[in-house]
């Protein structure tokens, strides 16, 4: 079954690569329109998935990721339209020039070909990835989690209807709707057909893909994100940033999980933090210093060492007091996932040092980690957030779904 999907996807990718920007945008507009027109069927499938997942004991954080609402689905359709407005990188000449030999050389952006994406309980990924792949002339094979198979199947049917209406092969966007996990292992060996693989899920999925895949893999999306409250931080705006980074949508990978507090500001800052977190319903996981300083009003539990390496994806926040900037940077290097980290400070020398020494895909000064998102970065919907350094890093927009080829123009030109 998967080999036939691969053959069809590869054939579709050749046709997609020839489309003009206008033709690709018309396809995306049709997809957005169909998502809104077929909203009832998608939401009905999603309700069944959510009910089944709840019965299976899925966590509230995962249920939130799984759930679609009319507003969320409308936002997904709007994201597709936003992709239409983005510049098409395909065909762009990156650089080039006339060589001494007389050969005129260009380095030009081209589609990757076929992209494979494995993801868990995130139905929005189906549309986000499909729209970005189509915009860049790539075919895509999707493998969502068993928790979302009804939603994904319904969504892909809508996308394929739009493709067919535009005269394009339905195989340009395909989903593996069989929840059998053995198919993941088979997909990981489809290097004959799939040019790049992107896993979006937990640490176990990423480990499996890194160890078993014969396809180049882009990993990321695991976000043990940190905020360091420097000794010079302005407490009021700092609290506002922390509330946003922790509570806006706790189940996302760009949510802060560990707060590092400079010891010189701890006694003034921690009580204010506790009050704010109590109002926001956040449980604090405090180290020894925090446990000594705080006595409410926020719920406070002792920090377990292993929690420093975990994504809570919930209204829980580690709080650690550090001696200085060195302590904060060392902690992030030991426990961070190179996703998103921030410093809250009024000292621009410290800000510059933090930016230069923290080796993460996104580093912020006096801003929330929640900005690490394709839409927020102006990239449109993202295919993933990469925490590695090759071939992409950070939110993966359109350019991350392209490669390049060298094109030489001559006039009977030969090498001397």
Curated annotation (Swiss-Prot):
A single GO molecular function term of this UniProt record: glutamate-5-semialdehyde dehydrogenase activity
Reaction it catalyzes: L-glutamate 5-semialdehyde + phosphate + NADP(+) = L-glutamyl 5-phosphate + NADPH + H(+)
Pathway named in the protein's UniProt entry: Amino-acid biosynthesis; L-proline biosynthesis; L-glutamate 5-semialdehyde from L-glutamate: step 2/2
GO BP terms, alphabetized: L-proline biosynthetic process
GO CC annotation, single: cytoplasm
Major subcellular location class: cytoplasm
Signal peptide: none
Top enzyme category: oxidoreductase
EC number(s) per entry: 1.2.1.41
Annotated compartments: Cytoplasm
UniProtKB keywords: Amino-acid biosynthesis, Cytoplasm, NADP, Oxidoreductase, Proline biosynthesis
Cited function: Catalyzes the NADPH-dependent reduction of L-glutamate 5-phosphate into L-glutamate 5-semialdehyde and phosphate. The product spontaneously undergoes cyclization to form 1-pyrroline-5-carboxylate.
Protein family per UniProt: Belongs to the gamma-glutamyl phosphate reductase family.
Protein name per Swiss-Prot or TrEMBL: Gamma-glutamyl phosphate reductase
Species annotation: Salmonella newport (strain SL254)
Gene symbol of the encoding locus: proA
